[in-house]
From Swiss-Prot:
Positions of region (Disordered): 23-55, 76-139, 195-219, 381-431, 448-638
Cellular component GO terms held in the UniProt record: nucleus
GO BP, sorted A to Z: cell differentiation; regulation of transcription by RNA polymerase II
Signal peptide: none
Record-annotated DNA-binding residue ranges: 301-360
Organism: Dictyostelium discoideum (Social amoeba)
Biased composition (Polar residues): 205-214, 502-522, 545-573
The protein's name in its UniProt record: Homeobox protein 10
Amino acid sequence: MQEIITNNIPTFKLQNDVDMVEETQPTTPTTQPTTPTTNTISTTTNTITSTLNTNNISPILEESEEEDSNELIIETDENNTSVSATGTTPTSSSSSSSSSPTNTTTTTTTTTTATTANNDFKNITSNNINKTNSNVNTNSEIKNIDNSIMNSLNRYNNITTASPSNSTMITMKSAISSLDEIVKNTMKAQRESFIANEDKESLPEPQTNSNVNGNEEAKDEKEIHLLAKILLNFSSNGIAVPNLSESSPAVLNTKLKDSSNLVPYGGDLNTSVNGVVGNSSGMVDLSASTGDLLGSLNAANKKKRQRTSPEQLAILEQIFETDKMPSQQIRVRLANQLGMSSRRVQIWFQNKRAKVKRGGPFGKGDDNDDLFAEGEDIIDEDEDEDSSLTIDESGNNNNNSGNNNNNNNNGIMGGHGMLSSSPTNLNTSSDNIVPSISPMLTSININSSSSTPTLQSVNLLNNTNNNNNNNNNNNNNNNNNNNNNNNHTTTTTTTTTTTTTSSSPPLTSFNFQLNQSLNKLTSPPSPPSIVPSPNKKTKQMGGFSLNSTASSLPSFPQIKLNSSSKHIPTDKQNNSDFSNFNNNNNNNNNNNNNNNNNNNINNNGNNNSNNNDSNNNNNKSNFSDYQPLKFHNSIVKN
């Protein structure tokens, strides 16, 4: 047989339909049923056996069904026996304290047990044991859960009633609301910052009326307006725009646009302003005005671009056609005449040379080109103008280790050493300018109709030539020409080389005749790089027809060319200009007798002895009779 479980009654197992053994007894939270005695168990067994043998099973079953449908309420009998059931037959048992149960108790127990047995028999016969057991178990579990819930509620009510937790929560809410009120009343300015806004969002809002909140918001807006006006009026180093709410003031925008004393703090202002613009609907975008302000500040810091006028460009172009690499003196004079700085003039020539080198037209340029049009040689004008210039004032200008060694060669400066076609021997840098060259030599263009470019840096008239043998050293010290051991230095050029900046011609016309410059010469000073003391006057040597002495003039090896060799013409059509001179120095190498201390040069009446450096011209003539002197770089050969 299977187990038979009922509410509030002991559970028995039937063995061979005769013996019943007690197994378990569930407990209820309110009552504790007592254990049935041995007499009760035996009486129940006898009753079940007699009931099964009788024919009155049906009436008993009907009676049990009626009893099952009734709900019994907890009652207490005379012996204080607890009986409680819901939907089942009441169960009663005698108290464990009573040692001898009475007849009434025995009869009640017997009747209850018989009814229970009939009910169990009914379940067995209807083959619903499993279903009944499951239902009964479910009902009991539900009842237990309900009881536990009720107990928990009772305990919670007891705890909340006894402890002040509820009042504590109320107190916290009131404290939070009071704190919010304090912040609103005493920390108005801090409410505009991010921290105040975050605190406001994190704190629970006090439960107040909507009208009160509306009035407080209106007051806050007015105070924000006033605070914004104060900040805008008294801010001199900039303003940190607060992260305002949706109702931000419009006066803040107008003041930000019109205020010129505000210096924004870069990205911080932009980010805060962008955040405000993203959250506010009636606010104008401040990022554009801020960008304009930053742009104006950057533009003010930038240096103005200085442009050359068309007149300045025309003069610069004209000079560039004649001399592409002017010396420092020419640049200074040009700057004074044109109203420019010498640094700008130098940079213009550098840019022009770079443009021509890249393949531009020779001597042509865009009139709209400004000083900084080229990207190659651009140098800032604020630098020291003379910082990049190196002037050699030592008085010794030696090319190729200072020795011009020529073996059986004819030509200017004792050969082709200084006028070699290779540009490596020439000074092509504008930063290494020797001031021994007179500015007139580089700027005078006597024949204005001449179309062929001539050598403008050095004006060489070959009255005499330098004959230097294998050990000839050209040294010029204090304007004394010492011929020691086959040292022979001939220093004759036109007197235009002694013309210094003391009588500089105007740059508007570059055509001068030689007599105009000679009329101004009384005792010409020496170039600054040749004579250490400029106040020292040169001595006139007798027996010479020239107005200026040869000792006051620089020697040929001390003159460095400032123009590139590729622009030196190689035509010999200008050699006819030497026909105006009565004396032509023809150097015949076959007739040069080189003794220990004697140099004999056949120059049509010009005798060069050991310690005498002279050039004798047979015919005395005035320089005014000569034709206007041209610039020549051609080499006179035999």
